[in-house]
Amino acid sequence: FDQRRCTGGKTCEMACRDYHDLGTGPAFRTVHEYAGGTWIQNDEGAWEHDVFAFYVSMSCNHCTNPVCLRFCASDAIAKDDFGFVRVDAARCTGCQVCALSCPYHAPRFSEASAHIEKCDGCFDRVAAGLGPICVEACPQRALGFGIYDDIADHPLMVERVATMPDPVITCL
């Protein structure tokens, strides 16, 4: 995710919602806005500000050591051959422990299906040689997809987004 490119347009979120036919249910990818700052009038009467806003597009990180997988009592969560963390709906009991344990809040309980749903990495598209729909839909090219070591070598790689939990939680 290249935060400098994200304009908060939510095209990634909507493409995911459409592709997975999610309707108004839990979204697998969400764009969060973080904003703050103040306006103050200086001694000359002019207004000055330190206002800021930025966006973070979040989805399942398909962690190296997923906390959700560790806490799933029904063994409904597993990593596939591509490294995607996936939920087996037939095994999911809907207890929501995985959702409560995930530091990124990726697994979401669906009232309609009565089980956990989450980003599956568009495994079907990846198996066909395509990228995840969110990556391909972003007009600003703020999302990337590939081998972590290749992405980690990018000169603008950021290991941690200030507003999110420390990734060491899911890498040990």
Role assignments for model-derived ranges:
Residues 1-172:
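Non-ligating segments of multi-cofactor redox enzymes
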